[in-house]
Amino acid sequence: MNEALKNILERNSHRNLVEPIPSKDEMEKVFQAALRAPDHAWLRPSSFIQISGDGLQKLSDIFVDFAEENFDDLTEERIEKYRNAPFRAPLIVVLVSTKKDHPKVPEMEQIISTGTAGQNIMLALSALGYGAIWRTGSFAFNNKISEKFGLNENQTIIGY
């Protein structure tokens, strides 16, 4: 069977992610693969924020701050869940879709392009022997979280 097809057919989401993380050179290849996603009019709506090491604690703080500011009836158990969420993986890639004005390419198509870039990231990591999982939930498609990342109004986090 063709190796590319085999990789697609055998890829699974991995809930328990552990070190080692991909090297800088491997991540360059992963991001090159991501940018080969379909992209009508070559708008390049996709960008990526790579988080590891001390950045995981910063992401944890963002999640907890957001939860405390926005969720009613927040239990200590739920706060702990949000606090620990970034530490389920030693490396997190935040998928950001940037809306660009174009007469023939609506925003949804640009978001889909970033989604396919995310799939390419997952396939590239799988081909390199790493596990991956796409997560969304309350912290994706969320303007308040995007603000905490310093993103602009036209930028949306579509997954982690």
Where is each model-derived feature located?
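N-terminal amphipathic, basic helical "cap/leader" segment at the start of enzyme domains
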Residues: 1-88
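Conserved hydrophobic/aromatic beta-strand scaffold that supports enzyme active sites
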Residues: 7, 92-94, 160
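Short, surface-exposed loop/helix-turn segments at secondary-structure junctions
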Residues: 64-74, 104-109, 148-149
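A glycine-rich helix N-cap at a beta->alpha junction
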Residues: 149-160
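Acidic-glycine-rich active-site phosphate/pyrophosphate-binding loop
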Residues: 68, 87-100
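Small-aliphatic-rich amphipathic alpha-helix that forms the alpha element of a beta-alpha
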Residues: 34, 93, 99, 103-147
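Structural motif
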Residues: 90-92, 131, 156-158
